[in-house]
Amino acid sequence: MTSIVFMGTPAFAAPILESLIKEQYQVLGVVTQPDRKVGRKHVLTASPVKEVAVAHDIPVFQPEKISGSPEMQQIIDLQPDLIVTAAFGQFLPTKLLKAAKIGAVNVHGSLLPKYRGGAPVQYSIINGESETGITIIYMVKKMDAGDMLAQRAIPIEKNDDTGTMFDKLSLVGRDLLLETLPKLIAGEITAVPQDESQVTFAPNIQPEQEVLDFFTKTAVEIDNQVRGMRPAPIAYAVLDGKRTKFWDVTPLADEVVTQAPGQVVRKTKHELVIAAADHTAIAINQLQPAGKPKMTITDYLNGAADKFATGEQVINK
């Protein structure tokens, strides 16, 4: 039986680990982030991957940083045939990579060489890609730069967000890994180097990227940003003087407007349309003013009877 050490943390990685266990690979240990305090009550919470491991009585290692940790030597001492990572988020030292007898492989959420880095799904949506996918690669010291073992693309639908794409890609990654590992173990697979001329990067999302800019971004680009930031951290703008999270919007492709960016195009009881760059317009469907719950635009406008006149500047630079 082929032995594996699995490394991962979020919900994306949990079905992948579950499938390895069900397929009768010998999972010697699981490496995941330490338990974190979650929510307003700061409840100490295990990662989704740890929950799977504990449910199957698999030893769990939780170093804050694996490089140089006591846990690293313990993992090396397990002498696994394979190391498999999925959304682990840490570099693995060469010494650890070499501990796997067959190799160390990573399940990455993009069509490499595009979108190397920690936020490939988010950038695929923000940049308006029509598809993304999973690439299984050998792990090397350089980030997401290893030779490719397998790749599979799936479409990004117009209503997909980062949450729905993570759910879809998790299952694609699970299935592709289960198809790939037997060939890898049998020596029946030829790894393909990545084309370095096509490399793009997807570094972790920074706070300034959460801000919606109606003055330089078109309605479609704003919609892409909103969906790329959902379900977290949620994109925002200052609307009517208040920091407001935009949960759901619709770009109005057929409308060419004369209002300046950030001005009201129209308002009804159930609709608020705001101008964006290049004479485009966007309808706001769901939002969340600071300190308040998420609400529909209808509920929001109920409390704003005398506001949002056509042409009013409601979003400022």
Curated annotation (Swiss-Prot):
InterPro entries assigned: Fmt (IPR005794), Formyl_trans_C (IPR005793), Formyl_trans_C_sf (IPR037022), Formyl_transf_N (IPR002376), Formyl_transf_N_sf (IPR036477), Formyl_transferase-like_C_sf (IPR011034), GART_AS (IPR001555), Met-tRNA-FMT_C (IPR044135)
Reactions accelerated catalytically: L-methionyl-tRNA(fMet) + (6R)-10-formyltetrahydrofolate = N-formyl-L-methionyl-tRNA(fMet) + (6S)-5,6,7,8-tetrahydrofolate + H(+)
Keyword annotations from UniProtKB, A to Z: Protein biosynthesis, Transferase
Positions bound to (6S)-5,6,7,8-tetrahydrofolate: S110, L111, L112, P113
Record EC number: 2.1.2.9
Molecular function (Gene Ontology), one example: methionyl-tRNA formyltransferase activity
Cellular component annotations (GO), alphabetically ordered: cytosol
Pfam families associated with the record: Formyl_trans_C, Formyl_trans_N
Class of the enzyme per the UniProt entry, highest EC level: transferase
Function: Attaches a formyl group to the free amino group of methionyl-tRNA(fMet). The formyl group appears to play a dual role in the initiator identity of N-formylmethionyl-tRNA by promoting its recognition by IF2 and preventing the misappropriation of this tRNA by the elongation apparatus.
Sequence similarity: Belongs to the Fmt family.
NCBIfam families: fmt
Protein name: Methionyl-tRNA formyltransferase
Organism: Lactiplantibacillus plantarum (strain ATCC BAA-793 / NCIMB 8826 / WCFS1)
Source lineage: Bacteria, Bacillati, Bacillota, Bacilli, Lactobacillales
